[in-house]
Amino acid sequence: MDDFSNLEKHESELGAFFGDLAFEEDSRSEDISLEGLQQELEECESDEVVANILSSGDKLREYAKGVENNLRKVELDSVEVAILLPDYIKESDKLVSLHDQIRDCNCILSQMETLLSGFQEEIGSISSDIKILQENSMDMGLRLKNRRVTESKLAKFVEDFIVPPKMIHVIVDGEVNEEYIKTLGILSKKLKFVETDQAVKSSKALKDVEPELEKLRQKAISKVYDFIVQKLIALRKPKTNIQILQQSVFLKYKYIISFLKEHGKEVFMDVRAAYIDTMNKVLSAHFQSYIQAFEKLQLDIATSNDLIGVDTRSTGLFSRSKEPLKNRCAVFALGERIQIIKEIDQPALIPHIAEASSLKYPYEVLFRSLHKLLMDTATSEYIFCEDFFGEQSIFYEIFAGPFSVIYEHLDSVLSSCYDAIGLLLMIRIIHHHQLIMSRRRIPCLDSYLDKVNISLWPRFKTVFDLHIGSLRNANINTIWEDDVHPHYIMRRYAEFTASFIHLNVEYGDGQLDINLERLRMAVDSLILKLAKLFPRPKQQMVFLINNYDMTIAVLKEAEPEGGKIQMHFEELLKSNTSLFAEELLVEHFSDMIKFVKSRANEDSSPNLERSITVAEVEPLVKDFGSRWKTAIELMHKDIITCFSNFLCGMDILIAGMTQLLLYYTRLEDCIKKIDGGSALNRDIVNYQSIMFEIKKYKKTF
């Protein structure tokens, strides 16, 4: 607005100076009059604006143009103002009202500011009061906490220190039951409190309470000792189930032992010794009676005469009557005795039930049953001792007696045991029992089982050496029989060896393999000596083949895949089979074989002194053609007679006929090279005929 008024002022001044001059018109216009110009200029000298223009030296036209532009701008602004001015005037009442409201608000806010300032001062005062109250509250809380701690300690002290009348009544007059055990626990805590708490030792009340606690301790110890002794007496009664009594009575009151350990060490040692003595005697008697009972069930398998190389055929009637009952088939053969390994974890035999059935058992069955009973008893006792007494060493003191009883029994049995198979079965049983105890994680029988194992192996080695010695020292003249069928000693050997191979399949015992090899060498030597007693080589070979074949068949049952020993006898069988087949052919076709081996080979030599002629081979061809079938039939009958194993005999016959075909083929080849040999073609047996005969026997086979 100020700029607008200034512009109007300048315009009026210029109007007064220039009149109604239009700036857009050209000053050079001829219509403009210059009269009086000097006078007007003089009059305007005193004007400040004009003086400034003239003094600055600006051109009048340029200045006028600038003024014109300013005027136009002012004109435009005035137009905008003129447009907005009516709206402004229209809303002026509202603006006035708004101005009044703002003024009223300022008054209200000023009042509120004053009020809040007052509140702030009051809150500051209250905050100080609260802080004081908070400090007082914390102080009171700390004092309350200290009082409660003091009260708690004092209450606990009083509770741990005093002896309630009810506790005295239970300890002195009560029966030993669950309530009594709980009261013992309370008494134990009080005794420990008096012994260990320094505050109690300096307390004057100790003089009043300590004598009473000591009386209660002595009474409790006396009472629980009598209780335990009565239960130990119950263990000694015949037919008492020890394990049930331990589980239902002793373990139920096992805190008594803990109490005695802490507050009656001497009495605890007496109880411990009494339990050890009781259980030692009870278990020793138990195992002693069990051993005596199953000795009646024992089946004696072998004696000192039951060795592979010992001739037992000549035993007289009177000497037989003195021998114990034995299963002759089980002396050298494993048979059904292997079942004991498969039934290793079966329950122990009950003697009176087994005796009622009138059954007898090989010793390894009784051995397993005895050790099954020992394992179960030892496992139960070991766990009980650890749970009841809290120590493992007590077990070994208890079982010193039972171990001694069993050791004594085993020593007496092993010293007279000649059953090698039974001994190895017992060794395997011990091995499985060690595995069972390992799975149970019960180590209490480790040293015992090791000791038994150490006792078994030397005896087994001794008996095994006796068998080897019996073969080496056998009197061949006594045991020899004029029979080419398998010898009874070789059958014993085969069954004996097969038994040990079977028992060693899953164990791979190298020491046993060495002993079996020693046994094989001894029987090899013996069987060759027996074979040489036959007058004819053919009989010797038949005897050896029959024995080797039987041995292989027995060994295959024990180890179908074939082991080192079986392979050895297979090689011997193969070599003797070839020799026998050759011997059989020589017996029936000696001339032809002799010719083929000597003269047929000469035919290929360039330096011949004497050529083979038709006359030389013609008798051979005609002889073979006339009787070859008959000869094969005789060979067949001979083989059936000689060999107990039909399959083995057929193998030998087929091998012999195959060899015969080879000899005859070589003879034919020789004839083809002889001058005039074609004349013998009508007498030659063709190849197909011989093959047909071989196939015929193969079909029979």
From Swiss-Prot:
Topology with respect to the bilayer: Peripheral membrane protein
Subcellular location(s) per record: Golgi apparatus, trans-Golgi network membrane; Endosome membrane; Golgi apparatus membrane
Tissues and organs where the protein is expressed, per its UniProt entry: Detected in pollen.
Keyword Coiled coil: yes
One Pfam family recorded for the sequence: Vps52_CC
GO biological process: protein transport
Source organism, top-level taxon: Eukaryota
GO-annotated cellular components: endosome membrane; Golgi membrane
InterPro entries: Vps52, Vps52_C, Vps52_CC
Keyword field: Coiled coil, Endosome, Golgi apparatus, Membrane, Protein transport, Transport
Ranges in a coiled coil: 23-45, 511-533
Family from the record: Belongs to the VPS52 family.
Its job: May be involved in retrograde transport of early and late endosomes to the late Golgi.
Subunit structure, as described in the record: Component of the Golgi-associated retrograde protein (GARP) complex.
Name of this protein: Vacuolar protein sorting-associated protein 52 B
Organism name: Arabidopsis thaliana
Lineage, broadest ranks: Eukaryota, Viridiplantae, Streptophyta, Embryophyta, Tracheophyta
Gene from which this protein is expressed: P2
